[in-house]
Amino acid sequence: VFQGKWAVCSLKNGSSSVESSIKNSYDFLDSFSYIVLAFDKDEAGRKAIDKAIEMFSPEKIKIMSYPEGYKDISDMLQAGLVKEINDCWWNAKSWMPQDIIGATQLKDTWLERPEKASVEYPWVCLNDMTKGFRLGEMVTITSGTGMGKSSVVRELEYHLLTQTPDKVGVIHLEETTERTIDGLVGIHLKRPYHLDECREITKPSVAEEAFDELFYRKEGEALTLYDGKELSIDKIISRIRLMAKAQNIKWVVLDHLNLVMSGDAKGDERRNIDALMTKLREVVVETNIGLFVVSHLSRQAGTPHEEGGAISLSHLRGSQGIAQLSNMVIALERNQQSEDPLVRNTTTLRILKNRYTGETGVTGYLQYDAETSRLRETIKPEEM
């Protein structure tokens, strides 16, 4: 084929012998400026290329490609394509790992990519700064103890169930599945259905109708809940992956991050949270779900968070990996000890991180209505 102009070496026993063949002729092969690998175009050939690359400097390797319909040089020779073999040899490209891509290779997919749809939050003030939330993102919601994180998350769950056709998965580690359903049905009925006295005055038929409207769909379950006792990192990650892949769930809520850490008590909290956040990020990228994560705060000097103290990213409990790996971090601030009931029940929404638009700061206020068990958008009370 090359008329003796170029050195040609063969593997003694096919692709499986690549390592031994190279070792036996290493000094000779390594003496050349570059080496063209012309292995079979199949899985065994690809593995042989990977093994050969490990044994030489990557910049020395070029990969020969075959025309469509031909597996190797033998196929081309039998078809009489001698000139074409020479062309393939001269056109061999320098080896490049699959995860390193030239920008020009991305042009077509860049131009033809589908529009990334956003889902709006239930509150206009939050949408103004964030432009909603999207699949493939991880949003962390944080506040002090007893500040209404679960109420905000429940409103988000209800919003997803009623305003999108998507399936929702929830992992509430501090409450029973019964309490989760009570909360969502209560939002639907605009009453605190989790309270005994409220359930007593609600007709069973009304509650059942609300349940059916929320959770029954022709396509299957609208809501899937985690009802396990195990809190280990691996268990929670496996359940999120199962929800996404086996049940086609698009949105998952994990409430809360720090309780998962209590199930993996080995090692220090910071490293455990780093490990969990990294795995959560990997699952989000792998499955393209939208993930909401609830996180607690560390105690700080100055005004306590429970008395309205301002929150910053450095207050996130345990690890800065929470802030670094989240697409969005939303803080809830409230003075739950205020003597003024209006102030006591008003939550400030503060964006601490916003990878999508870059806008941060106070974005609005939510007022809790105990009679309806709902959070509604409001203006800042004069007393705050």
Where would I find each of the regions flagged by the language model?
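Conserved nucleotide-binding/hydrolysis micro-motifs of P-loop NTPases
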Residues: 42-44, 68-70, 174-178, 230-232, ...
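C-terminal regions of RecA-like/P-loop NTPase motor modules
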Residues: 146, 196, 216, 233-252, ...
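The Walker A/P-loop phosphate-binding site
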Residues: 97-191
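Core recognition of P-loop NTPase motor domains used across DNA-transaction enzymes
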Residues: 59-135, 217-222, 283, 359-363, ...
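TOPRIM fold recognition
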Residues: 1-109
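Cytosolic-facing regulatory segments adjacent to core modules
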Residues: 128, 162-248, 262, 363-365, ...
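Helical hairpin unit composed of two closely spaced alpha helices linked by a short loop
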Residues: 242, 249-291
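Flexible beta-alpha connector loops of hexameric P-loop NTPases
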Residues: 196-201, 224-230, 261-274, 304-314
